[in-house]
Amino acid sequence: MSETTRRKLIEVALPLEAINRESAREKSIRHGHPSTLHLWWARRPLAAARAVLFAQLVDDPSARPDEFPTQAAQDAERKRLFEFIERLVVWENASDERLLAAAHEEILRSTGGNPPPILDPFAGGGSIPLEAQRLGLEAHASDLNPVAVLINKALIEIPPRYAGRPPVFPGTAHSVEGVAGHWPRATGLAEDVRRYGGWMRDEAERRIGHLYPLATLPDGREAKVIAWIWAR
């Protein structure tokens, strides 16, 4: 069977129950999920995007009769792929480097070692290009909405550019956060965001903090104001 007609797993079947369960569960995740950093109104579940990308690139066993000549062999291999996807869509496994590397190897095996780049021309909240990148694929995104463009720059363009690099904030490159000066993935960038964010807050307080006085409580104590309501 030629490469152009090879049937992909998504054309045959998917473990929809597991994908749906994890997609629904994402709504309650409040740590590390992009939705906690910014709002997008039609955000696609990361679990579904990850599963669909994997299944549309990996061959269905029926497309490889040389490796799986019988129906029983094809069913067994399809079951293995289903179980793999069921692990792949779990949120707690989203940063499992060994699992993601195994997913990438499965994709390479089905694409002759040369998987196609992934383009989402209306990327919105960035779920598809983000998950393509997580699976080790070349990802591209665009959108008509400038907010979506900014979101995708922050998700898939800037972090890879600075992956593995130490922070540039003075005095942090060899601090305790980096183990022996090693900053894996985008941890160096994240440290810079924390450090420069703190610096900007302190500088703003130094310059205009006097415009935001402490509130006097009924018992005479003073406390910081959590939110100001402006009225005319």
Residue ranges and their predicted role:
Residues 1-232:
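S-adenosyl-L-methionine-dependent nucleic acid methyltransferase catalytic domains
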